[in-house]
Amino acid sequence: MLKTICVKTNNKEISKYLLKELEYFEVQSIHVSSYKFKVYTNVIIHYKGKNIELFLNKISTLLAYLIIDFYEPSIIQNLINTNYFYFSTEEKKDIYNLCLTNIDFKTSISIINIISEAFYEYFFYNKYVVLDGFVNFRLKNYIKELDTVVDMCVNKFIIDREYNEFVSLLKAYIQTTPSNADAIHLIYKNQNSILLDNSKNAIQYNDILINSKYLSDISFSSNDYALNSLLTLLPKKLYIHLIDVEDDFISTLKRIFGNRVYICTECDLCALYKSQTSKYNLNRLKN
């Protein structure tokens, strides 16, 4: 049984890519030829085997990867320019780069399946395909998937921008405001903060320390009051005793307080709180 497919493109790089990939095509019994006309280059694949479904499946997957390599960047760029035209050129570039890095493995598999299924269904009833037209009119679900990725990345970009503005404002405030404490110790354990003064006595989060003007839309949940207290006290040195791993809150403190921050993981204070954690975990296992 003979099955013929003709792929039409006016992009030289696409035709070269397709011909090269077909040299290593996994399906036997195919003959490939290429003809250049005034508008399009036609890449023609003749299949003389018996397993038409396998042939269509493999050629559809090959074309799906081709679409991702050659069309996806411009589709993403067009979606950004159309839906988010009010961002600056530099901001659009940042959003575009975010999109490229945020298409994870799961999303990639989903996208490949969407495109290959569209080609598979199309080739059951058609012998030739114009790639530009196919992308514009037959891959609506694919473009919708990319639109979702762009929306997600725009939201992430806005949140990151607000976060960076927040950090910059606080850094400027710290640099222009006198310190109210020589040193503060912050014990960071189970994503919660305990503040100690220079004598290692506990600092209470009371109304005297809390100044609402330092509160921000950027929230660290239970650590908001710790951050506010630090912004009120403005220590010359901030010793962070990491009982657990460093997370976003600690990274933010390092950005805000800069060279005032000293990370510690092995002092007597660290050992004390680590031993308390170990005893707690041991008691939980016994119970």
Model segments located where?
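C-terminal structured domains
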Residues: S199-N287
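Conserved mixed alpha/beta catalytic, RNA-binding, or beta-rich assembly cores of soluble enzyme
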Residues: M1-D224
